[in-house]
Amino acid sequence: MKMTKNFKLQEFIPASVYEKYGDNSTWFIDDRLPTGAQIVRDELYTKLVKPRGEYVDLQMVINGKDRDESGFRVPSTETGQPLSQHRFGRAIDFQVLGKRNDGAWEHIPSLEIQRIISIPTVWEKLRGIWTTMEGGTLGWTHLDMRYRPDSEYSKGPAIVAIPAK
């Protein structure tokens, strides 16, 4: 099931959950999450592909390949923290790959993602949906939709990213 221009429902849901519930798996994710992911993807595409010409395409990876719990996490999972926003269907962890002119895909460092998303105009687009971004792990960035009107996240960007080693 297509959620946005570039994301399918299966990217936000573990395969086992989708197999059981199919398109009803939308029950398990916050409606704002695909929208936030699409905003981030569009902004990264605009900043990394169009002006530079260094990349000819961009892929934002949530679930898929060896990743199955980067979106919604079932209550019984041992992945992450017990009260993680993932368990409420309000978070994704993602990596970004850029396709070079020679056809090879390469990982775009989390610090580069942090730099782009920290641009005030990008953050304004995300702020309307109460977004938190962090990257306190290696090689990926966290995006969630928790409601925090009195925190620093409601006033501007709060992004931390640590590049993969």
Task: Give the ranges of each region predicted by the language model.
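Catalytic cores and adjacent binding grooves of peptidoglycan-active enzymes
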Residues: 82-92, 96-165
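Feature targets compositionally biased, intrinsically disordered low-complexity regions
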Residues: 21, 35, 52, 63, ...
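Extended, low-complexity, intrinsically disordered C-terminal regulatory tails
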Residues: 32-80
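Extracytoplasmic cell-surface/polysaccharide-interacting catalytic and binding patches
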Residues: 1-52, 146-165
